[in-house]
Amino acid sequence: MKFVDSAKIYVKGGNGGNGCMSFRREKYVPKGGPDGGDGGRGGHVYLRADGQMSTLLDFRYKKHYEAQRGVHGQGSKKNGKMGKDTVIPVPCGTVVRNAADGSLIADLTEEGEELLVAEGGKGGKGNPHFASSTRQAPRYAEPGGVGMALEIELELKLMADVGLVGFPNAGKSTLISSVSAARPKIADYPFTTLVPNLGIVQYREYSSFVMADIPGIIEGAAEGKGLGLQFLKHIERTKVLAVLIAADSEDIEAEYASLKREMERFGSGLLEKPRVVLITKMDIAPEDFSVPSFSDDAPVLMISSVTGEGIDVLKDELWSRVKSEG
């Protein structure tokens, strides 16, 4: 399935049903009073967070959503039914903004969370509402109100516990495929991963956490170079970052410093998140490899997703940090 993380849609509440102008007409009641029913309220439009959805792809094909109109009132004081609401499912982690000014409307993060985005119009009042001592036979009924209309922007920010960060070919996709059921494309060239991937990592017998693999960062990602800026937002919500650097990197310390710079430039508190440095591909580490140390005292783990070296220790470390972050 194609991954789409932004969309713009038009939503409109249903118009209210018209009130009815009617008079009681029965045998032996030649001058019955007004008996027009009220119109029904128009349907509302809601967004609902759905944990089964992982992309905004559907909104590339359908961009207009309108709730049902309220039913008109009838004679004999029969009120019209309310219009049916329209409920639009969106992935958990969807940010909703007003397209006109970019203002934040809501951030839907919890399964089943609902947001009213367009109210239906009020039902019009039937002519009995307009009767008075001086006007006992009003020949007027109120039309239904117009439903609210709004253009909204949807932006998906993935929900994960651990975010994998690294330059292209650092081994992120291989790691997530080795510890979860996720099967991202893997190859020995840069930018194999073109979209984010989520994997559920089983820990011990009854626990698990969610890991997110995003396309590799390059120098200047925070300024929009490469794929970095587009996808760095998907690790904003993560509790812990795992920074991956390949053991055969020419300069591990310099690569780590570069990754930190990009996270700092992007902002959103990425650099303040707890992180673990993973030296990957230890199965092909050079003979003169030495364990690096970093000035920020970030814990360093040596792993190989191919041989399984260090994977259990990695799971222990990540689980401990995820739990400590709540």
Curated annotation (Swiss-Prot):
Mg(2+) binds at S173, T193. Its EC number is 3.6.5.-. GO terms for molecular function: GTP binding; GTPase activity; magnesium ion binding. It comes from the Bacteria. One of its GO terms (biological process) is ribosome biogenesis. It holds the Pfam family MMR_HSR1. One of its GO terms (cellular component) is cytoplasm. Its cofactor is Mg(2+). The keyword GTP-binding applies. Gene3D superfamilies: GTP1/OBG domain, P-loop containing nucleotide triphosphate hydrolases. GTP binds at residues 166-173, 191-195, 213-216, 280-283, 304-306. Belongs to the TRAFAC class OBG-HflX-like GTPase superfamily. OBG GTPase family. This is GTPase Obg. It comes from Chlorobium phaeobacteroides (strain BS1). The gene is obg.
